[in-house]
Regions:
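Acidic, proline/glycine-enriched N-terminal capping motif
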Residues: 1-79, 83, 88-91, 99-101
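Glycine-rich, small/acidic residue-mixed loop/short-helix segments
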Residues: 93, 242-250, 260, 264-349
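Short amphipathic beta-strand starts and helix->beta connectors
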Residues: 28-37, 80-92, 97, 127-130, ...
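Anionic-ligand-binding alpha/beta catalytic cores of soluble enzymes and soluble regulatory domains
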Residues: 190-280
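Short glycine-/aliphatic-rich beta-strand segments at the starts of folded cytosolic domains
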Residues: 42-64, 135-155, 271-282
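Acidic, low-complexity central loop/insert segments
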Residues: 40, 49, 94-224
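Glycine-centered loop/turn motifs
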Residues: 74-76, 162-170, 287-292, 329
Length: 349
C-alpha cells in the first residue's frame, strides 16, 4: 500500500484531500475545537522523509547539519538545521534512527515535503565518494499523529508500551512510536508503521479519537513552539532566530558543518538579536509563512514563520522578529495586531 492508496482509504472515511494533504474530515472548525479537548488522530502523509544509508551515513550528515548525529542511537530523535555557508537555514529536519546506525540501521530526516526534492538533490551533491545512499521514503512508512490527554494510554494495547520522554523513540514489532512535545495535559506522538499494520492501528485509534486534518496538527506544532522552513522562508534565518538552540537542535561541541562559523559566532558572542515568538493574530485572512510584520512606524521587524487557524476563529502563529522591536511596542501583520503569548519553553534574549 502506497501513501496514495492509504489516502484513498481515508477518503472513504470522509477525508477531504487537497494536493495530497488531508485537510479535514468534514468539519474543520469542530476538529480544531476537539483538538483542545480530546484525543485526536491525524494523517501525516504530508511530511517528507529521507532515508540515509551506508557506512559513511553518520559522518556524512555530521558535516551537514547543526546537531550531533552520533547521538541518534535508535531510541531517540532530535531537531537539526541544514544551513547554507552563511549559516542561513535551508531546511529543518526531525532526525532519528529506527535502529542504531553504528550497527547497520539507517538514519531518517523528516522535513516539509515541499522542500524534499531540492534538499535531497543538494545533499547528494556533497556525497562525492562517501559510502552514502539518500532515498525518498516518504511513501514507505504510513505516518500518523496522535494527541490528547489519553494518547499514551491508547497506544499501549496496540504496541505493548509507549515512550514516556519527549523525543524518545520506541521501535516495536508492528511499528515505531516517537513522543513529541505537547502542551497542557496532553501527550503527542507520531506513529510509523507499514501497510500491513496501518489499517488495524488506525481503526483502533479512530474508535477513541476525533479524526482531524493537517491544520490541526500544524496548530499543535505551533503551540509547542516548533518552527518550520518552507520555500518562502529558506535562507532567511540563522538557527537561533527560530529558537533552535532552545530546542536543543544545535550542538556547539561537534565538529565542523556547513554554516558552523556563523552559528557558533552568534552563540559565543551572545549576539542573538532576533527570536521567534508565539502569537495570536485577529484577522479574516490567513497569515502565510514569509509574510512581513511591522512596528508602529511601518518598519519591517520580522516575519511569519508558520501560522494556523485556532479554535477561537482567528490565527496562531510563530513570528520571528527583532527582540528590541517586540519589547518597544505593538507589532502588526497588515493592520492586525500581533499579540505575543508565552511559549512552552523559556525564551532567552
Amino acid at each position: 500500500m502506497t501513501a496514495t492508496e492509504w489516502q484513498t482509504s481515508l477518503a472513504t472515511q470522509d477525508a477531504v484531500i487537497e494536493n495530497g494533504v488531508v485537510m479535514h474530515f468534514g468539519n474543520p472548525s469542530a476538529e480544531l475545537l476537539a483538538t483542545t479537548k480530546t484525543n485526536v488522530l491525524c494523517d501525516l502523509t504530508h511530511l517528507g522523509l529521507l532515508e540515509i544509508n551506508g557506512a559513511d551515513a553518520a559522518s556524512f550528515l555530521q558535516g551537514q547539519v547543526t546537531n550531533d548525529v552520533k547521538l541518534l542511537v535508535g531510541n531517540n530523535a532530535h531537531y537539526t538545521a541544514y544551513c547554507n555557508p552563511k549559516g542561513r537555514m535551508l531546511a529543518l529536519f526531525l532526525a532519528f534512527a529506527h535502529h542504531n546506525h553504528e550497527l547497520g540501521g539507517h538514519l531518517h530526516l523528516q522535513l516539509n515535503r515541499e522542500l524534499l526534492e531540492p534538499i535531497m538533490k543538494r545533499l547528494k551533491m556533497y556525497v562525492m565518494r562517501s559510502k552514502v545512499e539518500i532515498k525518498d521514503v516518504s511513501d514507505s512508512p504510513i505516518k500518523f499523529g496522535l494527541n490528547g490527554p489519553e494518547a499514551a494510554k491508547l497506544l499501549v494495547p496496540l504496541f505493548t508500551k509507549a515512550p514516556s520522554q519527549d523525543y524518545e523513540l520506541l521501535s516495536l514489532e508492528n511499528g515505531a512510536i516517537l513522543k513529541l512535545p505537547a502542551t497542557g495535559n496532553n501527550t503527542r506522538f507520531e506513529v510509523f508503521t507499514d501497510a500491513a499494520n496501518a489499517p488495524t492501528i488506525w481503526n483502533a485509534l479512530k474508535a477513541e479519537c476525533q479524526l482531524v486534518g493537517k491544520p490541526c496538527w500544524d496548530w499543535l506544532e505551533i503551540q509547542a513552539g516548533i518552527p518550520d522552513i518552507t520555500s518562502a522562508t529558506q535562507e532567511q534565518f540563522v538557527p537561533q532566530m527560530l529558537n533552535l538552540d532552545l530546542l536543543n537542535a544545535i550542538s556547539f561541541k561537534k565538529g565542523c558543518y556547513t554554516g558552523q562559523e556563523i552559528v557558533a559566532r552568534t552563540h559565543y558572542l551572545g549576539s542573538v538579536k532576533r527570536r521567534t515568538y508565539l502569537a495570536s493574530i485577529e484577522s479574516d485572512r490567513t497569515p502565510l509563512a514569509g509574510d512581513k510584520v511591522m512596528d508602529g512606524t511601518k518598519n519591517e521587524v520580522g516575519q511569519i514563520v508558520r501560522a494556523a487557524a485556532n479554535p477561537s476563529g482567528s490565527f496562531d502563529a510563530l513570528v520571528e522578529m527583532r527582540i528590541d522591536a517586540k519589547e518597544a511596542g505593538s507589532i502588526y501583520w497588515n493592520d492586525a495586531v500581533v499579540t505575543t503569548k508565552n511559549l512552552p519553553y523559556a525564551l532567552e534574549s
